[in-house]
From Swiss-Prot:
PANTHER family linked: 50S RIBOSOMAL PROTEIN L33, CHLOROPLASTIC (PTHR43168), LARGE RIBOSOMAL SUBUNIT PROTEIN BL33C (PTHR43168:SF2)
UniProt name for this protein: Large ribosomal subunit protein bL33
HAMAP family recorded: Ribosomal_bL33
Taxonomic lineage from the root: Bacteria, Bacillati, Bacillota, Clostridia, Eubacteriales
Organism the protein comes from: Desulforamulus reducens (strain ATCC BAA-1160 / DSM 100696 / MI-1)
GO BP, one annotated term: translation
Organism domain of life: Bacteria
Gene: rpmG
This protein's record includes keyword Cytoplasm: no
Gene Ontology terms, MF aspect: structural constituent of ribosome
């Protein structure tokens, strides 16, 4: 079962990305290193609820 999730920057707390994840394979919150246009650098983005 795939669900939509929002990714927020850990530096500025802005919600920059939306993506889908498989809850069966990834039951925990995901963390991805993505580009933040507000920080102008690559930062860790965490899943928000």
């Amino acid at each position: 079962m795939r669900v939509g999730v929002t990714l927020a920057c850990t530096e500025c707390k802005r919600r920059n990305y939306t993506t889908a994840k498989n809850k069966k394979n990834d039951p925990n919150r995901i963390e991805l290193k993505k580009y933040c246009k507000w920080c102008h650098t690559h930062t860790v983005h965490k899943e928000t609820r």
